[in-house]
Amino acid sequence: MRANRNEYVDALMTRRHNGLVKVLTGIRRCGKSYLLSVLFKERLVAEGVPEDHIIEIPLDKMEFAHCRDAVRLGEQVKAALVQDGRWNYVFIDEVQLTRKVLPPDVDLARIAPEDREDAYLTFYDTLNDLRQTDKVDVYVTGSNSKMLSKDIDTNFADRGFQIRVHPLSFAEYCEAKQPEDKAAALSDYLVWGGMPLAVAEDDENARARYLVSLFDEVYASDIKKRYRLKDDYVLKRLIDVLSSATGSLTNPHRLRNALESVLKAGPSDHTVANYVEYLEDAFLFSEAKRWDVKGKRYLDYPLKYYSEDPGLRNARLGFRDVEPSHMLENVIFNELCARGCQVDVGVVDVGDRRHEIDFVVNRVPGKLYIQVALELPTDEKRRQELLPLRRSDDFFRKMLIVGRYGAPRLTSDGIVEVGAIPFLLDRTILDKALAG
């Protein structure tokens, strides 16, 4: 079983030798290390790069534990460089494990308390130094909030480029599993998702145990350690609430009320908002804001949250209430994000009633409104689903993703209708719709 993840490898290949540090971020266990150390490395070697010109530093391995010092990391890499006029490729895995270092000639007592943090050397200093070394191309992976977009933008300025890596998409899932029945494969994907090791596991009980363990042994533990939480009980209950509310409108106050019904004494709205931010920072959930289509403005609350992977969401709920229709909406949201789109939830006022467009999709060169439905069994259901698209009162393209199969077709009122499987497997369908 293998997914070649060509979109990511191609993105890395096109950004070689551009003078920037290439930073692969994403949820832990989504395959960043494999992408870099196996797939990208194979492509480089196939194009003639000698293997001794590829320096790999997996910081999560005991063999390289000594490199978790920011200064020693740089020294280790420079000692391994081949000086023959050809490019060296440096792969540093889990770079956030690197510790900051105080230079020996710096006396903190002579520095104002508010400036002391700047006295330390961090992995950002190491990476920026390596980036400026002749014929050195730097690639790193990071999994948690030490490698956030805002941190990368601040510390690298215009010297770093972030590539967000997601779990296997449905297309990558099919590439790896080679299913004959795509409809059955989609049903399986809506339950188990695309975490690579879960996809590779054929035994459903083992697959379920693995997905459940990720929350307790990896994600919740990481967040507790990173933010120095006294315990992770409230955090785990919040994960449960967000998982059960996937794709539903909510806000911190509603989440607090839901927690209060479970805990009998809920945390404050402020604490809930902070915890939600921690979960987003760990790439477990993504926020979708609401966009007033006719008023052309964002609405503050409520908003929606989607899980990074349907299998993780279902595992958190014990694989009860899988809700295939909601999971399909979640999968389409993730697919749009992975394809580089900005995705909001649309609001359309019709008379005195407020209707929803599942997704308002923005990406150069255009905008697209999308409704998603696993099935529309009656004409009335179909009319209700299409109403907000028809009453948006603008010229942007509209799409209805309905059912599993169904080649793209244009309806009499100009709406592109397509099945979920063709949409997820053929990227050109979205490209053409956005291009108008």
Where would I find each of the regions flagged by the language model?
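Domain-level recognition of nuclease-like catalytic cores that cleave nucleotide substrates
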Residues: 405-436
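Pre-Walker A adenine-sensing motif
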Residues: 1-17
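Conserved Walker B catalytic segment
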Residues: 96-139
